[in-house]
Design a protein with these regions (language model features):
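Acidic/aromatic/glycine-rich contiguous surface patches that form carbohydrate-binding/processing clefts
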Residues: 145, 149, 167-173
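Substrate-binding groove of N-acetylhexosamine-processing glycoside hydrolases
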Residues: 89, 164-169
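Flexible, glycine/charged-enriched surface loops at secondary-structure junctions
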Residues: 41, 155-164
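Catalytic alpha/beta core domains of metabolic enzymes, predominantly
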Residues: 2-127, 138
Length: 175
């Protein structure tokens, strides 16, 4: 139903995540053809503008779902001022978009809290972070999800049920 779409390239510490414009447009066309909703991955500000341009060209249908990826070396730092700026730009460019921020590694929990506070969605799990806290490894994805779910109450937020999540993301209901 969904797949990641990075709308530009980024220099990772040991390699280049290469996504030239013609490749990105081809992926967007294929996703549109097969009814796959892109999760726009934003590793730098230009990727947000690239996504807006793809939407203007009709290669991505709205409302978009955008994920800011914070805390990877050579990309966006996990700083609150950067997070706030990205949200501000998103609201100006794509006001109907849903959004989430992913904090990698030691930044995951802090970025989760920023998202809850600012009205965004939350991403958690072992793909981005192996630790439950500074003192120990997470036992499972479920443990990390439970940590975020428990935190929702403190921000007057609730955990979406699958049908609600599909609706929020603009996905067809599951059969």
């Amino acid at each position: 139903d969904m797949a990641s779409l990075a709308t530009g390239s980024v220099n990772f510490p040991t390699n280049i995540y290469e996504n030239p414009p013609d490749f990105v447009e081809g992926l967007a066309r294929s996703m549109l053809e097969y009814g796959i909703k892109p999760e726009i991955e934003v590793f730098d500000l230009a990727m947000l503008y690239n996504a807006a341009n793809l939407a203007k060209k009709g290669l991505i249908e709205g409302p978009l779902h955008v994920q800011f990826v914070l805390g990877i070396a050579n990309a966006l730092p996990a700083r609150r001022s950067v997070f706030d700026f990205l949200r501000s730009e998103l609201l100006q460019l794509l006001p109907d978009a849903s959004w989430v921020a992913a904090g990698t590694g030691r930044f995951q929990w802090e970025v989760n809290q920023w998202c809850l506070e600012a009205g965004g969605h939350v991403r958690t799990g072992l793909e981005d972070n192996l630790k439950f806290d500074a003192s120990r490894l997470a036992a499972s994805n479920a443990e990390l999800v439970a940590k975020v779910a428990d935190a929702c109450e403190g921000y007057d937020r609730h955990v979406a049920r699958p049908a609600e999540a599909r609706q929020l993301l603009g996905l067809a209901m599951a059969a």
